[in-house]
């Protein structure tokens, strides 16, 4: 199509040149050479375009075909949220330490101290363990006396009897209490932090302007991995919610700006 256009255009130019008396005629060989060059340029352009298309098709054919993501079946947890467990033993516990977290502990004895890097000021210990008074006295020595106060008062302790929880998908799951690993069974302990009371002072959180704000201390939760079962089957690691902090919730009083 483009070659035909060139031919018509050149014929048009030649007709104009023939009607003009002031311009000299182009030699016949010059006009022919110009036509040949235009035709060669058009052929080369079409050839390059075809080569580019072939290269793109060859490249697409060499790429591996992407598999469509498989939708989880009904009742089947997602891979990123659930790791099944076939058998629990000392070797298994040693190979799955990467799932351990500071707030979830697998141990054959009740922990007596808070996890590393956690504050000891709000640790209340376990009332069922002996020598609790001595430990609390020892922890009290670490408290600061710089006149600093928290907006909310919290307390932390090891929960030894957690039986159920809500996982990251909103399902009610059963927390494995005792895990048999031979001669010494282990238990799961959860280091939880919660509010002592909703209103540490008369009007809510400490240090909040009660003329403009309503305030209340609330326990906040975070997801941690734990060994659980769903519908008495599918035992494995899941993300569950546990109490981890005490925060102050604010709402502006009506009519205040």
Curated annotation (Swiss-Prot):
Disulfide bond annotation, renumbered to this chain: 152-217, 195-246, 205-248
Subcellular location: Secreted
SUPFAM superfamilies in UniProt: Cystine-knot cytokines
Skewed-composition ranges (Basic and acidic residues): 67-79
Record flagged with keyword Kinase: no
Superkingdom of origin organism: Eukaryota
Keyword Magnesium in record: no
One term under GO cellular component: dendrite
GO molecular function term, any single one: growth factor activity
Transmembrane segments: none
GO annotation, biological process: cell surface receptor protein tyrosine kinase signaling pathway; modulation of chemical synaptic transmission; negative regulation of neuron apoptotic process; nerve development; nerve growth factor signaling pathway; neuron projection morphogenesis
Cited Pfam families: NGF (PF00243), NTF3_N (PF19338)
Region of interest called Disordered, as start-end residue ranges on this chain: 61-81
Main localization of the protein described in the UniProt heading: secreted
Propeptide span(s): 19-138
Leader sequence residues: 1-18
Function: Seems to promote the survival of visceral and proprioceptive sensory neurons.
Family indicated by similarity: Belongs to the NGF-beta family.
Name by which UniProt lists this protein: Neurotrophin-3
